Regions:
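Thiamine diphosphate
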Residues: 1-91
Length: 91
């Protein structure tokens, strides 16, 4: 969403129904990779949240409530897909 881009990150989709078991995160061209992986995980019976991260810097400026609404704190399993730079993903 346009608002999500302005906030640095947004939920692209929740797949599989119910509480997500894993959060897949990516930016740029890698977003298509997490979409494919998410669909495959749903086929295997998993619930997945897909998050697009256009800007770590903008996301870090958001209030904690927004950050928690995107990166659910109760979901500890998280995978970041990035072909170039690891900056930001360690957070």
């Amino acid at each position: 969403s346009a608002e999500g881009v302005q906030r640095g990150a947004y939920v692209l989709a929740d797949l599989g129904g119910g509480q997500p078991e894993v959060i897949l995160m990516a930016s740029g061209s890698e977003v298509s990779l997490i979409v494919g992986a998410g669909k495959r995980l749903v086929e295997l019976g998993r619930s997945v949240r897909l998050v697009s991260f256009p800007s770590w810097e903008l996301f870090a400026e958001q209030d904690q409530a927004y950050q928690d609404s995107v990166l659910l704190p109760e979901v500890r399993a998280r995978v970041a897909v990035e072909a170039g730079v690891s900056q930001g993903w360690r957070q």
